[in-house]
Amino acid sequence: MRMAAVLLVAALGTACATEGAGPTGTGPSGTGPSGTGAAGHHGRQGQGQQAQGGQGQQAPQARPRTASGALTAYVERYRRAHAARTALARKWGLRQVPLLPPDPPKAKPEITFREGFEVGDPDLPPVFTTVPTRDRVVFLTIDDGAEKDPELLRMMSELNIPYSAFLSDYLVKEDYGYFKRMQDLGVALHNHTLTHPYMPALSYEEQKHEICGQQDVIERRYGKRPTLFRPPYGNYDADTLRAARDCGIKAVPLWSAEAFPDRMEWREWDRDLHPGDIVLTHFRGRGDWEGSMADMVRQAMDTITERGYAVARLEDYV
């Protein structure tokens, strides 16, 4: 609602400027829920100009839109957009309409190691659980690739909820096409190793094979080499981060909370969300959970929205 109020003020200001323009001023312009509308430009033809038929006449003037008219038009556009989002939230069983995130930051914040997660070399890819931001946003990430539920793709696309996927090839290779459809819907695909091992038990070379091998798979199958990596189970050592760096990884996001169909689990003592928190979940279904992927999304989104947060795209900040 705060965003709506800001946009209403912007629309009113634009309309007032239009109303004060003379006959040679610009035509109406305004902002809508999805961006800035284009302004038309209406000039005045000179008096006595000969029309094509030879009779002198003045071109008709476009009447400038009044402030109240522009505001009414904006409110109607906003009302329709909100009604559509409300209908989709109801369709998918959400208790509230998800909040919209702010525009992405013009400059991405500097990512550093979370305190206590360092391995002694500050030049290695940083391990973190929260993105440094004052925006009331969190980031939804989904790991591994075991469950390939088409309902998840429809739900997230219709609700326009951004998320990121961290994939392991031993699960993804059962249906590479599912994750290509996900990518085509705007989801970024990242590295979660080839076979999902406990990384600290492996040598540097073995860890490098797991990470670089998955880099190669994702690049070959999906056309882009990831820069983000999440170690299986969140476990890593200095060799893990050295191997990740040598495979082209820039950062290692872990998580602050984990979402299930029936609950949230929390890393922090206050059991709450904070600006920039990363939320983990998994590609799972009724075989592993008491619910489906859609049930998990409903529970997570209700929690996130009720606590006053929007879901933003991780790659816009990292």
Stretches with model-predicted labels:
Residues 235, 240-272, 309-316:
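His/Asp/Glu-enriched short active-site or ligand-binding loop at hydrolase and phosphoryl-transfer sites
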Residues 124-133, 173, 291-318:
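C-terminal domain-boundary segment and adjacent tail
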Residues 97-191, 195-198, 217:
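Active-site beta->alpha N-cap acidic-glycine motif
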Residues 23, 28, 41-63:
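Intrinsically disordered, low-complexity repeat/linker tracts enriched for polar/charged residues
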Residues 157, 161-162, 188, 197, ...:
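CE4/NodB-like, metal-dependent polysaccharide N-deacetylase domain
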Residues 145-148, 167-175, 198-205, 230-236, ...:
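Acidic-and-aromatic substrate-binding clefts and catalytic sites of carbohydrate-active enzymes
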Residues 138-142, 163-167, 188-191, 227-230, ...:
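Structural recognition of the beta-strand scaffold that forms the well-ordered cores
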Residues 1-36, 58:
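Secretory targeting and sorting signals
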